[in-house]
């Protein structure tokens, strides 16, 4: 959500200013990704990859390019079909498709998806989060169904799904910090979440 991105940027600026009084003179921009919906027509992905490099076409890449249709609903809970895609992103970013307006539009959307997926790759030494607290009754029907399909062990509450996902975003032996209710430590509905952390 764009407002959350702006608040995150503001918080980072204020923390940096607290540590370094001349920070505002440095013209430094925070590295924040606000996930956006990106959609493709059925034929567009194949046409695009055939034009830029047919060897790149795989079912995994095709699936990935269609995973951000509802990014505003699922957010960073999305698990990209491909991870560690920086090389692929660099390769496609270097492709010139400016001669074809149709391909240029698809190209920009593909780069946006890959950039967003790169942010959601497991590469972080530290993950700190204040996951949203929302039980199943508060979720829209699409999110509730999607959670059951993708986070079946922790579907009872949105914050527990985010705790699992944030753990996946960290490198092995990474540091994690959550602002979360304590209920997951003792309620039976969070037993699988407790097992998840014990087994990590």
What are these regions (language model features)?
Residues 1-200:
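SAM-dependent methyltransferase catalytic region
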